[in-house]
């Protein structure tokens, strides 16, 4: 175990961004080399993840980095000599140089192990976080701007974007290094730089660089668990099962402490107080890196806002966006680190963690909000007046009910001549619910405030009472976002949309019939979908081909012949979503590959057009054929970038959420 990883207990940052990795000695062990050739699209379909990561690395870092990453993705953890055995055309020193760059960009993690003979070996692991940062690099820069006030903090926006660009390009950055690159800045500019760093650190987009960023989660868990297990006394009467459970409980506490402290560095707090001005500033000697988990929370919020827009409406989705932006920083992450350790093979552990996360969604400080909180943060150009249906709609229903033809009732007299009055009209249950709903949305039509609390509360009630639980109410007037129950619905809805748009509405109809009925026969599907039997069979064959549904054979008798069996159909969403994820991954990688091929085929023309003496004078210095070809290249590249953005928004739902 290296010094950086040993410093995880207690916390310590990796010195020099992990540059000390290459100085360790590797053993001479080697395995039989197996060439990895993904030149053809057929071979790339065997591992779409490897295809995507290799293309990303090739487009951003070059051919050598792409080759090294491909080996690590396909073969797992390897030492430098083992990597060299798979890539003999690269020298050992070149591989080490590439690994240093990949480690600094968080594309590779490492761990030092000591064998029984005492020999220390550094093993390298592929880390997809660095590739995700490359994949989202453009959107990260644009999304950061949304967290600044465009009117009052425009001077900080450009600085914040430059800081993020430098952090993504270098992997990590200190305030001191950034100020050194801005040596010509005056005192006002330096103050603004400090304020931009403070703002990004407050939002947790920048966090201190720690050993956890370079350590594989699974190996970290194994180290903590073995350490706690070895501490237990061996001469006690406790069973081995109790010892393991005790060690597991202690290791979980230490593991959660390590992975859930992004705002602390190894030497103390990240924030300091400037003795001269009294303002808060970031410690200039602390290495900062980008917090991918925090950014993915904002991507999740954007997906939920678009989902609410399609189901509730545009105005309510804007209210929802403000509520999510208030709470996303303190909300649960997309996945808990313990889910990557293998503990979820135990059903009790999985259930316990899921219950804890559900409680955190409601009880953690900063995750709940009220209508007043949302109203204070609404944009000034948003006018909510006239966006809700008022209670006068219920009056129309009452009038319609009163205008119904009268029902003549028989008059009943008692023995003494008393006439029994008719029974009062009982309102139906549906009408009562409608009146209750109207009462909840009973607003003042003469309200002059376009962003009043009553209007905001009306939209929150729409989100609360919808069939999809966009928000829930923990206390009267206090709401929270139930991510654990909302994300599965988002996945199913996205999957249905893809099926409907690619395979047609008939496939979507059959898929919904099977989902609603569970395990069902072909006759049941034909009856409920109101389709012909021949069409149903064709659609079922297509859905089975794409792993959207599964076939289960149920024998009717002891005879197992196929002719005497009944075939039922069901949906297993885990398998269906995984197939869709692999499909989208391959298409995304293929699109990136085509864009890179387009640039390579027109490299000479692009190089000529990007020369300083040609820019702005293309019509004068380029031939007509070159101008036409340049226009074709630009159009194809723009079209490819739009398609990439759309694919990315679909891919992340199944890959990251």
Swiss-Prot record:
Pfam families: HTH_9, POLR3C_WHD, RNA_pol_Rpc82, RPC3_helical. It is found in: Nucleus. SUPFAM superfamilies: Winged helix' DNA-binding domain. InterPro entries: POLR3C_WHD, RNA_pol_III_RPC82-rel_HTH, RNA_pol_III_Rpc82_C, RPC3, WH-like_DNA-bd_sf, WH_DNA-bd_sf. Residues 390-450 are annotated as: Disordered. One of its GO terms (biological process) is DNA-templated transcription. Residues 584-605 are annotated as: Leucine-zipper. Residues 428-448 have a biased composition (Acidic residues). The keyword Transit peptide does not apply. It comes from the Eukaryota. Keywords: DNA-directed RNA polymerase, Nucleus, Transcription, Zinc. GO terms for cellular component: RNA polymerase III complex. One of its GO terms (molecular function) is single-stranded DNA binding. Its main location: nucleus. Gene3D superfamilies: Winged helix-like DNA-binding domain superfamily/Winged helix DNA-binding domain (1.10.10.10). Component of the RNA polymerase III (Pol III) complex consisting of 17 subunits. Belongs to the RNA polymerase beta chain family. DNA-dependent RNA polymerase catalyzes the transcription of DNA into RNA using the four ribonucleoside triphosphates as substrates. Specific core component of RNA polymerase III which synthesizes small RNAs, such as 5S rRNA and tRNAs. This is DNA-directed RNA polymerase III subunit RPC3. It comes from Kluyveromyces lactis (strain ATCC 8585 / CBS 2359 / DSM 70799 / NBRC 1267 / NRRL Y-1140 / WM37). The gene is RPC82.
